[in-house]
């Protein structure tokens, strides 16, 4: 079993991506762990982040997490997410953040300066200074938000990564609901 696990881990760590991801974070969604095949390595994202995938598959399947990671909708709140988007500079970040909030695709966008992203692009390891947008919005707005980012972003492959909000201040989450479109 140890050699089988070692072989699988080596395959995952040594695998190449089928497309480059530009950005600060490469996140494995717990919702897609069960879809990973044990016989083939994950084909996108940060391959080095997936050394524990075989261990997580048995303990943390999407069925085990599906009820616990989704925030329950109440009369005052809706299922909500945090979305990470990287931008090349402050000007691009402000422009994109303003358009997202103006279109009511998000209640709030934080602009975090001074991040360093290391990634592979066109066969070469690159390193760039970027800024990170932390976007708080409704789960139901992920698709239109992603379309908006893709249409208004300078990158060929902009990073758009969503994480569920599993809880928080009821007043803040109510404000998030009321500040975004239905």
Curated annotation (Swiss-Prot):
Record gene name: CUTA
Gene Ontology terms: biological process = response to metal ion
Under which name does UniProt file this protein?
Answer: Protein CutA, chloroplastic
Q: Which UniProt keywords apply?
A: Chloroplast, Copper, Metal-binding, Plastid, Transit peptide
Q: Which organism is it from?
A: Arabidopsis thaliana (Mouse-ear cress)
Q: What is known of its domains?
A: A central prokaryotic signal-sequence-like domain may be used to export the protein to the chloroplast envelope after import into the stroma.
Do you know which InterPro entries this protein is assigned to?
Answer: Ion_tolerance_CutA, N-reg_PII-like_a/b, N-reg_PII/ATP_PRibTrfase_C
Q: Where is the transit peptide?
A: 1-70
What is the similarity comment for this entry?
Belongs to the CutA family.
Q: What does this protein do?
A: Involved in metal homeostasis. Specifically binds Cu(2+). The truncated isoform has less specificity in metal binding.
Q: Which residues form the signal peptide?
A: none
């Amino acid at each position: 079993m140890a050699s089988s696990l070692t072989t699988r881990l080596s395959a995952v760590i040594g695998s190449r991506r089928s497309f480059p991801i530009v950005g600060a974070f490469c996140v494995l969604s717990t919702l897609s762990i069960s879809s990973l095949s044990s016989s083939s390595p994950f084909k996108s994202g940060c391959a080095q982040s997936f050394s524990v995938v075989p261990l997580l598959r048995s303990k943390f399947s999407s069925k085990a997490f599906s009820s616990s990671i989704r925030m329950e909708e109440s009369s005052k709140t809706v299922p909500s997410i945090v979305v990470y988007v990287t931008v090349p500079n402050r000007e691009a970040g402000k422009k994109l953040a303003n358009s997202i909030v103006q279109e009511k695709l998000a209640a709030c966008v934080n602009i975090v300066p001074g991040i360093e992203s290391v990634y592979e692009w066109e066969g070469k390891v690159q390193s760039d200074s970027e800024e990170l947008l932390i976007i708080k919005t409704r789960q139901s707005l992920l698709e239109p938000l992603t379309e908006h980012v893709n249409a208004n972003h300078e990158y060929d492959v902009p990073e758009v990564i969503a994480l569920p909000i599993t809880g928080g201040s009821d007043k803040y989450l109510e404000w998030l609901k009321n500040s975004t479109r239905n």
